């Protein structure tokens, strides 16, 4: 089995369908004795250019170890799913398990926000108490 990195973009109106899609696609891989090494749901992000008059899409990243047949099955599923705007499957040399730069940036942004959010909540609680 080989290692692959898969990124697919989902129509923003179908964002609530993404967890089911992820479950279905990871099921295809695991049913063929494959392994999902990394799964990241990046959420809605701005597109670099409009696709089908859309300016945002829901991004998902998968790093998997799978057979060529299961990857072909995934690509076919992507092709026939109208909600999937774009997909990319790349073969990699080894399993990638650490967080992607996108996930790291989001975590850093969240960690920077949370202390200030806590302070704002405390300040508003103090103001309400007075």
UniProtKB/Swiss-Prot annotation:
Entry's Gene Ontology cellular component terms: cytosolic small ribosomal subunit
Keywords in alphabetical order: Ribonucleoprotein, Ribosomal protein, RNA-binding, rRNA-binding
Residues annotated as transmembrane: none
Gene3D superfamilies: 3.30.70.60
Recorded family membership: Belongs to the bacterial ribosomal protein bS6 family.
PANTHER family: MITOCHONDRIAL 28S RIBOSOMAL PROTEIN S6, SMALL RIBOSOMAL SUBUNIT PROTEIN BS6M
Job description of the protein: Binds together with bS18 to 16S ribosomal RNA.
Protein name per UniProt: Small ribosomal subunit protein bS6
Gene that specifies this protein: rpsF
């Amino acid at each position: 089995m080989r290692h692959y990195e898969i990124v697919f973009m989902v129509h923003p109106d179908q964002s609530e369908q993404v967890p089911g899609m992820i479950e279905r696609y990871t099921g295809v891989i695991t049913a063929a004795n494959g392994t999902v090494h990394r799964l990241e749901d990046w959420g809605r992000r701005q597109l670099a250019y409009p696709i089908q008059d859309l300016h945002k899409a829901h991004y998902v990243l998968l790093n998997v170890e799978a057979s060529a047949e299961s990857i072909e099955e995934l690509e076919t599923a992507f092709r026939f799913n109208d909600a999937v705007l774009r997909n990319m499957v790349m073969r990699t040399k080894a399993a990638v398990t650490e967080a992607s730069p996108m996930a790291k940036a989001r975590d850093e942004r969240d960690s920077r926000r949370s202390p200030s959010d806590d302070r704002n909540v405390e300040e508003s609680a103090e103001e309400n108490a007075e």
